C-alpha cells in the first residue's frame, strides 16, 4: 500500500488534576474515525483504546492492521499512529491515557535502573490485540474504564492497583512480542535512537550518535527513520524538546530561559523560534492561554511536515 500520509501531528494530553488517568468515555466517541484526517499523530502519554464495535484499520507506524469489535490497542508515547473506520461506517472506541513514566517511577521496590529498563521495554512498540487472544489484558483495560466511568468510593486506588497488573502484562507482551505482535521492522530498528532522544534531548544531539545507537550507518538510519516516523530525525528531536517545554511551562514556575535550557535549546531565541514554528504561538502565549487549562482534553497541535526545515 502506498504511503498516504506526509505529516505527523503531536497531541499533548493532560491528566486532570487529582486523577490517575485521562479517560475519554461514552457515546461522544462513537464516530467515523479517520474521516477528513490525512495524517498520523502521536502523544505525550501512553494511549490505550478499546473498540466496543466497528470495523476498520489501525495504522501503527508503517503497519495497517484491521480491527473489529473487542480489539484494543496499546500505543506508546512516541509512535505515529491513527485509527480509520471503514468508509461510511462508525465505530465505538473508548480511550484512556496514562503517564507511564510517573506511574512506574512511583514503584518503590525496584532499583531505578530496573524501572528505567521496564519503561524502555514497554515503550518499544505498539500493539493491536483482541479480547480473544489476550482476555486478561482486555479485562484489565475494561476495568480501568469502568472505574473511571462510575467513580465509586476508592476508584483511584482500584485504578492504581489495576495499572500495576497492566504493567506486568505489558512486560509479558514485550517478552513474547514475536508471537503477539505484527512485524514493525522500521520502528523496531530505530528504537535505540528514540530511547537516546528521550534520555538526551536536553543535550546537543548528533545524527551520528542516533545511528550509532541503532548500530547502523548514518545514511541508512536517516532513510529508515523517515520511513518509520514520517519525519526527519531533527524534526523529531525538536518535537520531543517542545513536548518537554510544554510540560515545564504547564507544571513548573521556571522562567523562559530556564525552560529553553532544560529542553535542549541553545538560546532563548532558538527556543522561541522553534516553539512558534511548530505550535504557531509563542511560549509565553501558550503558557497564558486559557484554552490550555479549561478543556478536559488539553489538545495542542504540533505538525511536522516531512522535509520541514
Regions found by a protein language model. Give the residues of each.
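Hydrophobic alpha-helical core bundles mediating ligand binding, dimerization, or RNAP-core interactions
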Residues: 58, 93, 137, 141-145, ...
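Structural motif
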Residues: 72, 91-93, 200
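A short, Lys/Arg-enriched amphipathic alpha-helix from helix-turn-helix/homeodomain DNA-binding modules
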Residues: 134-138, 160-163, 179-205, 209-214, ...
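Basic/polar phosphate-binding segments, predominantly the helix-turn-helix DNA-binding elements
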Residues: 169-174, 196-242, 254, 258-289
